[in-house]
């Protein structure tokens, strides 16, 4: 065959142009980078805001991933907006973690965050129905999604409700500043990332990598203290100590003991359920995981929540 130098140069230029565009798209965000579902985010941006010379992602694959997330987390309504709100709620960065601790922040960090929020707000304004090849297609359906598993215990309804409420509020933000204020208030009230959205955790230790990961327990049995009958003195002691702890006053470590089935674990869950909204979180650590405790403390030391380390079966 004949090697066409001119065509080869054009092809290289085209590939280089595509790479530059792809790089530019990925780097337009300053703080909100490395999103939990970054590839899906990028692909949706490419579908909704196509650029010349850019390869078109598989729209059906994107729809499938968003629907999978909706089933996993129980999302309803406009799934595109829910996905964007989920990205905002989960991304731990300099701005979001600062807001979790002190609330609204000013100065350059706030200005940099507004740069990102302006772009996300623009994404909220884009109509996913434009992706439909036919009238009343899959994307139109995803704008008014009804969750078939509404009464299911397969997902955490509290987390779902917060994400859906955030998405609706952001949809109606009339300015970049209002958009930023809504997200900032969310961070201050609930926190950000896994510690903001979840109440209970366990640890996973990677012996080879010498790494300790704190993973959410997504479904915690909703037991209330009023469900525990006949333990009024014990409940009073737990309540008094827990309230002192979350208020920053002196508190003690607690040892719960008794026969199997007497309510020890139920008491722990009930305390967690009652005080979660006031910032209480709980991390379950087993006896064989004690050597990873220092790594756990290192990961939670700068968060705005109050953490109880729950050690089960100390025998």
Language-model regions, residue ranges each:
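Hydrophobic positions in the central parallel beta-sheet of the AAA+
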Residues: 283, 309-310
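Walker B catalytic acidic pair
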Residues: 312-314
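AAA+/P-loop NTPase substrate/partner-engagement loops
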Residues: 274-304
């Amino acid at each position: 065959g004949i090697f066409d130098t001119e065509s080869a140069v054009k092809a290289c230029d085209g590939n280089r142009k595509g790479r530059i565009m792809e790089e530019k798209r990925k780097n337009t965000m300053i703080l909100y980078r490395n999103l939990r579902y970054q590839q899906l985010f990028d692909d949706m941006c490419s579908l909704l805001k196509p650029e010349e010379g850019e390869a078109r992602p598989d729209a059906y694959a994107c729809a499938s991933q968003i629907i999978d997330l909706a089933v996993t987390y129980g999302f309803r309504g406009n799934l595109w907006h829910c996905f964007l709100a989920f990205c905002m709620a989960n991304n731990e960065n300099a701005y979001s973690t600062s807001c979790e601790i002190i609330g609204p922040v000013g100065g350059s960090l706030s200005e940099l965050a507004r740069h990102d929020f302006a772009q996300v707000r623009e994404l909220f304004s884009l109509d996913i129905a434009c992706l439909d090849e036919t009238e009343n297609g899959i994307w139109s359906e995803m704008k008014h999604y009804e969750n078939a598993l509404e009464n299911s215990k397969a997902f955490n309804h509290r987390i779902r409700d917060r994400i859906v409420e955030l998405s609706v509020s952001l949809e109606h933000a009339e300015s970049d500043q209002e958009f930023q204020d809504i997200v900032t208030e969310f961070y201050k009230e609930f926190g950000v990332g896994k510690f903001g959205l979840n109440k209970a955790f366990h640890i996973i230790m990677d012996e080879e990598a010498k790494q300790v990961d704190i993973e959410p327990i997504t479904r915690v049995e909703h037991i209330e203290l009023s469900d525990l009958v006949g333990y009024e003195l014990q409940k009073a002691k737990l309540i008094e100590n827990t309230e002192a702890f979350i208020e920053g006053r002196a508190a003690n470590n607690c040892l719960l003991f008794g026969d199997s089935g007497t309510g020890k674990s139920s008491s722990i869950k009930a305390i967690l359920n009652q005080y979660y909204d006031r910032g209480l979180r709980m991390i379950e650590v087993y006896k064989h995981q004690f050597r990873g405790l220092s790594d756990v403390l290192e990961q939670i030391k700068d968060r705005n929540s109050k953490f109880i380390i729950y050690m089960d079966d100390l025998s």
